[in-house]
Amino acid sequence: MLALILAAAIDQPVLHYIPKHEELKYTFGGAPPTHHIKPGTRIVSWTEDCYDGAVTSADQLPTKVIPPGHDNPQTGPFYIDGAEPGDTIAIHIEKLEPARDHGISSFFPGFGALNGTDRTAILGAEL
């Protein structure tokens, strides 16, 4: 097992990466890495909120303002030099700051934290 620490001592290399909007990814996996980094590299980055910045007030419905396929944007991915499938990667978050003065969370039929699954039943209309 290989344990890589991305946020290590202060004398480690630092990657500052602020992605352009068109560099955000909307799926997990399959995208080429934005950077190759060495174990111990500290990453200073930014990402968009779960609705791609489209919801800007409490009276906006996410289903009405987000373009299809533009929810949950991702920053990266980063390729860790020397990491192999099966390795354990340790990531230490040193600091987390909100990008805006507001936050958002929501759920709607078939999506969100309060929906039933094949393992968790809820009382509600069938989809």
Give the positions of each predicted feature.
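N-terminal, charged/glycine-rich beta-strand/loop interface patches
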Residues: 12-127
